[in-house]
Amino acid sequence: MVLGRGLLGRRSLAALGAACARRGLGPALLGVLHHTDLRKNLTVDEGTMKVEVLPALTDNYMYLVIDDETKEAAIVDPVQPQKVLDAARKHGVKLTTVLTTHHHWDHAGGNEKLVKLQSGLKVYGGDDRIGALTHKITHLSTLQVGSLNVKCLATPCHTSGHICYFVSRPGGSEPPAVFTGDTLFVAGCGKFYEGTADEMCKALLEVLGRLPPDTRVYCGHEYTINNLKFARHVEPGNAAIQEKLAWAKEKYSIGEPTVPSTLAEEFTYNPFMRVREKTVQQHARETDPVTTMRAVRKEKDEFKMPRD
């Protein structure tokens, strides 16, 4: 994980959030956590589809997905509602849709406040534990945000109801985007809180891995530098990892996000996307992608991060 200077550690923040959520204080906590001033917003303009990258909390990302043709927008994981509404106002768009990847407080914890601040929002998600849910979705459910198509991809493992959102414009020349929450990170993947190595293999290789190679990957957290340090440990001879790590350090030093990546890139440096590669299997001392996934995830969970 990557931490801002002088900020709460990720574990401390998560523990604090969980404790407050148990006491019904989640929204109150989220309202006072404004640690993202050190990280910049980023607008990715892909023609008629724009994505505003909105840093949140310590290392989360929210994403405002804009159809420039109709000026309609969706928000992915709006944990800081006022920041979302300010961004929508800045772009002059109508926010109609909430896309929730999973129920964890740092992704879904702003839903209930947001629907109070702006009425009429459609709130999508794949888990009844998601606050303010209006539309429960399943694998391959589809919806529209203006002229943009949104396909819902079930990726259970980090949580049992985790959904990734694949967004494209029919007939458009711009590359599609996928919003992966805590399933796929830049150079990493989420912990297996409610699932298995087999499920994560299916999620990464069979569901996400079969999307177009130029698909932009927008993940839920800024964990890139530490993910790449672990990837370097797994494959020390992989030049793609070294190059991406140097690039990520430069981005982080000037406060810029390291998202998006692309699926094609992830297959070159993400050890969890590379569990079929001999170099990763040899490191794990396994010969099967699923057992390699299990071994590499266990090692990552216990990995002592170098300070470089």
UniProtKB/Swiss-Prot annotation:
Name of the protein this chain belongs to: Hydroxyacylglutathione hydrolase, mitochondrial
EC number: 3.1.2.6
Reaction catalysed by this enzyme: an S-(2-hydroxyacyl)glutathione + H2O = a 2-hydroxy carboxylate + glutathione + H(+); (R)-S-lactoylglutathione + H2O = (R)-lactate + glutathione + H(+)
Self-association and partners: Monomer.
N6-succinyllysine PTM sites in chain numbering: 229
Name of the coding gene: HAGH
Species assigned in the record: Macaca fascicularis
Keywords: Acetylation, Cytoplasm, Hydrolase, Metal-binding, Mitochondrion, Transit peptide, Zinc
GO annotation terms (biological process): glutathione metabolic process; methylglyoxal catabolic process to D-lactate via S-lactoyl-glutathione
Keyword check for Ion transport: no
Transit peptide as recorded in UniProt: 1-13
Domain of life per record: Eukaryota
Residues reported to bind Zn(2+) 2: 106-107, 182, 221
InterPro entries: Clx_II_MBL (IPR035680), HAGH_C (IPR032282), Hydroxyacylglutathione_Hdrlase (IPR017782), Metallo-B-lactamas (IPR001279), RibonucZ/Hydroxyglut_hydro (IPR036866)
